[in-house]
Each structure stands twice: as structure tokens, then as C-alpha cells.
Amino acid sequence: MKDLSIVFHTPEIPGNTGNAIRLAAVTGAHLHLIEPLGFDLTDAKLRRAGLDYHDLAHVTVHPSLEDAWQTLGDRRVIAFTTHAQTSFADVEYRSGDVLLFGRESTGLPDEVVADPHVDLDVRIPMLPSRRSLNLANSASIAVYEAWRQHGYPGGS
């Protein structure tokens, strides 16, 4: 889904970002990474998780969230957080949507969820008393739901 963007806000674990690179490559989504990153982009774990898909993915690293907003322009931003009331599955995803995810240890900061660029916040349901899902898994669940709703354009 070439017009869909995934944003990882200050990710910490290279393997998760490597998996997201692979996700972007196989779905056509664009991956945006907001610094500071908890790893170097040449990290062996990142490279291993992304396998040979790095050259097939569109990845942009931004020095700040503000820089990402400028690049992304006026697009609908959906923040994924465990604190939201709306399920991700209840959203009608649109062409050009931006799916925003927080760092592995803390999720999205409250000030990011409250940022005026964020249009809605959603959650991925899970059992009570569970803290969170893995970042790369959460992104995969969301991207595939958005792609499914559009009939998997370009997919086979």
C-alpha cells in the first residue's frame, strides 16, 4: 500500500525496526523513523531482521517529529496507544493515512498523542492486565488491516 506510512517514534530495539523494514518492503508502505534511535542503522540485528529487503523498502529517518510532520504534510495521523478507547479495527483506513507508534519501553508520550497533527488514537485489543504487544507485531497488524480494507492493492 504505497500511500500508507508507518512512523516509529524513537524506537529502541533494532530487530523491531528491521522487521518493520521488511513489512514496508512487502506491503509498499513507507517507514519513517524519528530520532533519537536506540541503535545504529548498520546494527547487525536490524540487518538480520530485515533480511535482504532493505533495498526494497522506502525508509526515511527524521531528526525530530516536527520534521516528520513537515515531510508527511496534511495527512490523517492515527496514533496507536494502549490508552485509547477506539479499536484499530473500527477505523475506516484511507489512502495516505499515517500510522504512528511509540517506542518499545514506554509507547507514545502523552504530548505526542495530544499533538494537533494526530487526528485519532486507537488501540489493538488484548487481554486485560497485559502491558503491550511487540512494536513490529503491532505495526504489522495495523498495516495489514488497512491494506485488507483496500483489497490488497498491488498484492498477490
Where are these regions (language model features)?
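Post-transcriptional modification and biogenesis factors for structured RNAs
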Residues: M1-S156
